[in-house]
């Protein structure tokens, strides 16, 4: 197990959500979303967007499916973010 997987596993247990989430699916979903937001919008927007995704998914009766759907939606939104509004590097 690598450091990231160990950390995610520990955090899921600490937050008492280990039975409610698939760490592998969640990791891929959140990292893809974070990459798209950081690259296309602004680096600080990535963790904030991931947090907001978690809040929205947590309010759902099916958090995994909701997180998948919303992550895809937000990735597309970030990819369409206008060039002139992107943070300068």
Model-flagged regions — what are they?
Residues 16-21, 60-67:
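Short, glycine- and charge-enriched coil/turn segments that flank and shape catalytic ligand pockets
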Residues 12, 65-89:
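C-terminal binding/interaction regions
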Residues 1-28:
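An acidic intrinsically disordered interaction segment
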Residues 21, 27-60:
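Amphipathic, hydrophobic secondary-structure cores in small proteins
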Residues 4, 30, 67-70:
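Hydrophobic packing residues in well-ordered alpha-helices of helical domains and bundles
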């Amino acid at each position: 197990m690598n450091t990231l997987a160990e950390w995610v596993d520990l955090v899921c247990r600490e937050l008492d959500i280990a039975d409610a989430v698939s760490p592998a699916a969640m990791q891929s979903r959140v990292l893809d979303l974070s990459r798209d937001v950081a690259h296309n919008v602004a680096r600080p927007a990535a963790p904030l967007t991931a947090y907001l995704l978690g809040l929205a998914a947590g309010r759902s009766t099916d958090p995994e499916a909701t997180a998948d759907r919303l992550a895809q939606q937000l990735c597309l939104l970030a990819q369409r973010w206008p060039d002139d509004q992107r943070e300068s590097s």
